[in-house]
């Protein structure tokens, strides 16, 4: 499939150091979460438009317990840069303030994109100021 091909290409280019190891530079957060299969998964969250307390968060990539990696890009007609700049502007105007909270962003992604409605905020574990090593260090499943 095209998404799998794109993901494999990105992984290859990152390993060869032809692309930076993260999509968005700056601070990251790692969120661990259980899914219905019993495994613990994790996601890497980034601040794509502005870094700091007033910057929105997005899910950059997530990792299954078996090591399968999935990159996340907004499904939109505009570039990711434009998309996140618009979301940041909306948030600056007081709309969608939950985008400022990495746990809320993670929970929304789990519900909407992974269709796991039974996972609540209390089941999520947040590691702030995380590194890529933190993200790739899989929990024991």
Can you describe what each PLM-predicted range is?
Residues 27-29, 52-57, 134:
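Hydrophobic residues embedded in beta-strands of well-ordered beta-sheets
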Residues 37-76, 141:
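Short beta-strand edge/turn micro-motifs at domain boundaries
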């Amino acid at each position: 499939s095209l998404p799998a091909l794109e993901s494999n290409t990105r992984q290859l280019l990152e390993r060869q150091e032809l692309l930076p190891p993260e999509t968005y530079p700056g601070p990251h957060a790692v969120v661990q979460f259980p899914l219905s299969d019993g495994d613990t998964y994790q996601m890497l969250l980034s601040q794509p438009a502005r870094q700091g307390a007033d910057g929105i968060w997005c899910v950059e990539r997530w990792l299954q317990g078996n090591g399968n990696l999935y990159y996340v890009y907004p499904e939109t007609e505009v570039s990711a840069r434009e998309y996140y700049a618009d979301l940041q502007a909306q948030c600056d105007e007081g709309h969608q303030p939950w985008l400022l909270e990495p746990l809320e962003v993670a929970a929304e992604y789990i519900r909407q994109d992974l269709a796991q409605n039974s996972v609540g905020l209390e089941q999520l574990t947040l590691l702030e100021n995380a590194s890529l090593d933190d993200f790739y260090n899989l929990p024991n499943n």
